[in-house]
Structures are given as C-alpha cells and as structure tokens.
A protein has these predicted regions:
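Cross-family detector of peptidyl-prolyl cis-trans isomerase
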Residues: 2-8, 12-15, 19-162
C-alpha cells in the first residue's frame, strides 16, 4: 500500500507540473497567442475611442494638444521632437522627455508608423499614436521591443530643422 501511495503522489506531481507547463506563457512573449491577441484587441478598442482616427495601414492617432496650424513636415524631412514610447501595459521603453532633451531624426530612417504619423502633425502639436507591429518593428522586434508589439507614442513636434 505504501508503494501505491508513493506512485500516486508521483503521478499527481507530474500531472501538476504538466498542467503548469501548458498554461504558463512562453518566456518569449512574442510567441504567445494570447499576448498577440491582446496587442490587436487594443487597436480595435481604440477605433471606438474618443477622438481617435485610423489610417488604412492601421495607424491610430489623435491630437491632444495644438490646433494643427503649424508647419507640417514631409515624409522626407528631419524633425525635432519630444516623445515617449510605451507598451500597451503602460511600460515605458524609450523617452526623450525622461532624458530631458528633444531628439532630432530624419523621418525616412524611422519606423513606418512615424513616417506616416508625424507628417499629420503641425509644429507645436502633440499627438498620441498607437502603432501596430506591421508598421513598427514587425514580428521580429528590436532591442527591448518584442516581435508583434503594438507601440504607443506621445509625440510633440517641436521643429522642422532647415
């Protein structure tokens, strides 16, 4: 009887370990189906959100400051901006605001979401963008950004340098 008890206990332990392994998300979140679904669901919810607009590529945007009357950059311009990048859970992955210094970038060297979104802004405007992976870092990701991530940015367009 003692042997049967040990076998039963071992079997239950194996069953518990097996069940845990099947329900825990993979260490690489970019391969987790639920995680991917959450990324897309976030964008769908924004379609119904107050003040949000969408482009055919899936970029979501809204103006949070300014009136759009400032000069607008072309997709080939260099821009000076303040920005904060976050994941949909609110975690910040990059910010010129945190560093205390605006950044200057040529738009053609940036992700497609910025190439498409920043030219919608006028100097002095602040926009919020929700950028699907397809026009951000794709399914491979880059640095701290996992593949498939929807990225959220708050961007203030400061200048379009000569």
């Amino acid at each position: 009887m003692l042997l049967f008890g040990r076998i039963a206990a071992a079997a239950l332990a194996m069953l518990a370990i097996s069940a845990h392994a099947q329900t825990s998300p993979p260490a690489d979140v970019s391969q987790d189906t639920k995680w991917h679904n959450d990324q897309m669901l976030y964008l769908v919810k924004l379609q119904r959100g107050e003040g949000w607009s969408a482009t055919p590529s899936g970029l979501r945007y809204r103006r949070v400051k300014g009136d759009g009357s400032g000069a607008r950059p072309s997709p080939t311009d260099t821009v000076t901006i303040h920005y904060t990048g976050r994941f949909i859970d609110g975690g910040e992955f990059d910010s010129s605001v945190t560093r205390g210094e605006p950044a200057t970038f040529p738009l053609p060297r940036l992700i497609k979401g910025w190439q498409e979104g920043v030219p919608l802004m006028g100097v002095g405007d602040t926009f919020e963008f929700a950028i699907p992976a397809s026009i951000a870092y794709g399914m491979k990701g880059k640095g701290p950004i996992p593949g498939g991530a929807t990225l959220l940015f708050t961007i203030e367009l400061i200048a379009i340098p000569g």
